[in-house]
Amino acid sequence: MLITAIKQTSPGRLTVTLEDEREIKTTLGVVTDLRLFPGRELDEGGLQEFERESRRALTREKALEYLSRRAMSRKELEKKLTDKGYDEEDAAYCAAWLAERGLIDDAGYAAAVARHYSAKGYGPGRIRSELSRRGIGRDMWDEVLDAAPRDDSKIDKFISSRLTDPEDRDQVRKVSAALFRRGYSWEDIREALNRFNATIED
């Protein structure tokens, strides 16, 4: 397949036109690496390589754009790319490429998520839910939660702001339910309420 034209469309972006009038969007890096120029003939293997490398380069550029806005897990990035129409295989390849270079760090990202929600006063259950929602594998959850410092002041502050009468069973029940929704276990809730001389009915 003959390359008939190469046109720059924006900084670092090019369009390569083939003799069958197909136009392939690509990057300057791909054109340079594959030594493409008008008049060059590509065999079937060369054309497939060009198309593959172009897709991957464009996917990688979009991934870096997303990562420049905020940190993401590997799965989260893959999903965002495929949701935007990028090929699933290219998205997985790109995420792996970025992870190998330390630009995606699931362990570090998971630890940051855990610290963030712990600091906001959420319990382990809510943190697990957030880790799952962000594509962090279950195999990391316990390690991340074990590393997060336990801070009883958060749950105590929540109780002190809501519980005005430890003897009021209805109030204790509502506070307990709210803490459970925030991700605390019944064991943690019971222990915290004991510090306020309140108990949960079995």
Tell what function each PLM region has.
Residues 1-202:
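An alpha-helical, amphipathic repeat domain used for nucleic-acid recognition
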